[in-house]
Amino acid sequence: MKLLLAIALMLTTVMWASTQQPQAVHTYCGRHLARTLADLCWEAGVDKRSDAQFASYGSAWLMPYSEGRDQRGIVDECCLRPCSVDVLLSYC
């Protein structure tokens, strides 16, 4: 009985570990970055941000900071350095 329990525990651990693979990272630049982001956002069902959502702020100079991802941009995160799909999706 103990052997069967040990085998079941080992198989469960192996199966769990195989699903916990790190997400692949790639470098996306230029047209490839724009196309990949558009495809991912479309698949995720996210509409493109419009200027209308920023109208309540009243000042155009606040627009870049209202959704804020610190001072970094998608080029810094995904072109200059490799990034994951999760990072790309955060820009949708």
Swiss-Prot record:
Top-level taxon: Eukaryota
Main location, first listed in the record: secreted
Gene Ontology CC annotation, any one: extracellular space
Disulfide bonds: C29-C79, C41-C92, C78-C83
Membrane-spanning ranges: none
GO molecular function, one term: growth factor activity
Matches recorded under InterPro entries: Bombyxin (IPR017097), Bombyxin_A (IPR030680), Insulin-like (IPR016179), Insulin-like_sf (IPR036438), Insulin_CS (IPR022353), Insulin_family (IPR022352)
Compartments reported by the entry: Secreted
PTM annotation (Pyrrolidone carboxylic acid): residues: Q20
Signal peptide location: 1-19
Record's keyword annotation contains Signal: yes
Keywords, comma-separated and alphabetical: Cleavage on pair of basic residues, Disulfide bond, Hormone, Pyrrolidone carboxylic acid, Secreted, Signal
Proregion residues excised on maturation: 50-71
Claim: Mitochondrion is one of the keywords in the record: no
Any further remark recorded for this protein: Silk worm has two kinds of PTTH: 4K-PTTH and 22K-PTTH; there are many forms of 4K-PTTH.
Subunit (UniProt): Heterodimer of a B chain and an A chain linked by two disulfide bonds.
Entry function: Brain peptide responsible for activation of prothoracic glands to produce ecdysone in insects.
Family named by the database record: Belongs to the insulin family.
Identification of the protein by name: Bombyxin A-9
Gene for this chain: BBXA9
